[in-house]
Amino acid sequence: MGKIWSKSSLVGWPEIRERMRRQTQEPAVEPAVGAGAASQDLANRGAITIRNTRDNNESIAWLEAQEEEEEVGFPVRPQVPLRPITYKQAFDLSFFLKDKGGLEGLVWSRKRQDILDLWMYHTQGILPDWHNYTPGPGIRYPVTFGWCFKLVPLSAEEVEEANEGDNNALLHPICQHGADDDHKEVLVWRFDSSLARRHVARELHPEFYKNC
């Protein structure tokens, strides 16, 4: 019986032991200021605990509801380990979307934000509680520091001009006249590099950051 663990049984163990040693030495991830409760939980405890469930956390409830949806075109479950968003990740994502195009000037809708959030969750393991904005009316600033896109309302003239022509689909967000917004404003994403240096949301709403 004592010979069950022979030398041949230990093949590969030194490599596994080294991986285990490195794992225990990995520094804790510091979430970006403004990341939500589930992300804070993940950063502080290494997992999402019963402090954040579908019954008491909107992001968790929303994610569980999305797992049954197939309209976004990719799997909802993440392909990488869950992790809280950091300042650098929010910053890098902002410039990636700016450089690659597509988000700047795009009319905001809840569905479009959901698609972006699900893409981040699926490809990066980032929980969607990073993607929040200050309340309106007017410009909505990102709650998470490092995210450099704000939501800017269009004027009535801009909305009217954008609606001209016969090619606009009736269900396009610009034609919905702010149906997804509490203040019925038509909002567009605008890149603002100064948001990487100045946390406007925290200046305007310090009460949002009491637990950060």
Curated annotation (Swiss-Prot):
Signal peptide: none annotated. The keyword Transcription does not apply. The record marks 20 as: Might play a role in AP-1 recruitment to the Nef-MHC-I complex. Residues 75-84 are annotated as: SH3-binding. It comes from the Viruses. Residues 154-186 are annotated as: Binding to ATP6V1H. The record marks 62-63 as: Cleavage. Residues 114-130 are annotated as: Mediates dimerization, Nef-PTE1 interaction. It is a lipid-anchor. Keywords: AIDS, Apoptosis, Early protein, Host cell membrane, Host Golgi apparatus, Host membrane, Host-virus interaction, Inhibition of host adaptive immune response by virus, Inhibition of host autophagy by virus, Inhibition of host MHC class I molecule presentation by virus, Inhibition of host MHC class II molecule presentation by virus, Lipoprotein, Membrane, Myristate, Phosphoprotein, Secreted, SH3-binding, Viral immunoevasion, Virion, Virulence. Induction: Expressed early in the viral replication cycle. Monomer; cytosolic form. Homodimer; membrane bound form. Interacts with Nef associated p21-activated kinase (PAK2); this interaction activates PAK2. Associates with the Nef-MHC-I-AP1 complex; this complex is required for MHC-I internalization. Interacts (via C-terminus) with host PI3-kinase. Interacts with host PACS1; this interaction seems to be weak. Interacts with host PACS2. Interacts with host LCK and MAPK3; these interactions inhibit the kinase activity of the latter. Interacts with host ATP6V1H; this interaction may play a role in CD4 endocytosis. HIV-1 lineages are divided in three main groups, M (for Major), O (for Outlier), and N (for New, or Non-M, Non-O). The vast majority of strains found worldwide belong to the group M. Group O seems to be endemic to and largely confined to Cameroon and neighboring countries in West Central Africa, where these viruses represent a small minority of HIV-1 strains. The group N is represented by a limited number of isolates from Cameroonian persons. The group M is further subdivided in 9 clades or subtypes (A to D, F to H, J and K). This is Protein Nef. It comes from Human immunodeficiency virus type 1 group N (isolate YBF30).
